[in-house]
Amino acid sequence: MKNAFFVTASIACGKSTFIEIANSLGFKSISADKIAHKILDENALELEKIFSPFSLKNLLKKEKKIDRKILGEIVFNNKEAKKILENFTHPKIRAKILEQMQILDKENKAFFVEIPLFFESGAYENLGKVIVIYTPKELSLKRIMQRDKLSLEAAKARLDSQIDIEEKLKKADFIIKNTNSYADFRQECVKVIQEISKGNM
């Protein structure tokens, strides 16, 4: 799809912030995370039955939604559970993303698709160009620990579960560095978005 631009990175690199900036400039977007969260909630009771053997903690919140923090702890520490979750959710997420992409592509204007596991999934390659947001590993770890209230060990486990950021950079069509202030990052984002917009006219 000529109007599709995928946004990916490692954890806590600024993908969602890029999307917010793009939205503020009048560009539409799709978020794999938001779609995934909705799918988890819609299938909460079934997922609770599947994953309750993996944990002594209650996977359901009071409002009958999945406790994503507990589910995250399970899948990041158990390869079997991770595979089960991926097999359950990924086809549903991909179908929804492709459905929304087809709608936006008809508008003949650049749009952005935020997919954290773009390279890991291998399900979206050749569907559009790729923007990789770069943050050094040390900074990513610090942000993960602060944002998600995780220990260094837990943060490393989450980061190590993904393809190394340096490998992702090699496959990028566009690279945006997020290593300094928000103002610097926004400037880098706007620059790339403008470049894409001009090339897509």
From Swiss-Prot:
Catalyzes the phosphorylation of the 3'-hydroxyl group of dephosphocoenzyme A to form coenzyme A. GO terms for cellular component: cytoplasm. Residues 4-201 form the DPCK domain. Pathway: Cofactor biosynthesis; coenzyme A biosynthesis; CoA from (R)-pantothenate: step 5/5. Keywords: ATP-binding, Coenzyme A biosynthesis, Cytoplasm, Kinase, Nucleotide-binding, Transferase. Pfam families: CoaE. ATP binds at A12, C13, G14, K15, S16, T17. PANTHER family: BIFUNCTIONAL COENZYME A SYNTHASE-RELATED, DEPHOSPHO-COA KINASE-RELATED. GO terms for biological process: coenzyme A biosynthetic process. This is Dephospho-CoA kinase. Belongs to the CoaE family. It catalyses: 3'-dephospho-CoA + ATP = ADP + CoA + H(+). One of its GO terms (molecular function) is dephospho-CoA kinase activity. Its EC number is 2.7.1.24. It is found in: Cytoplasm.
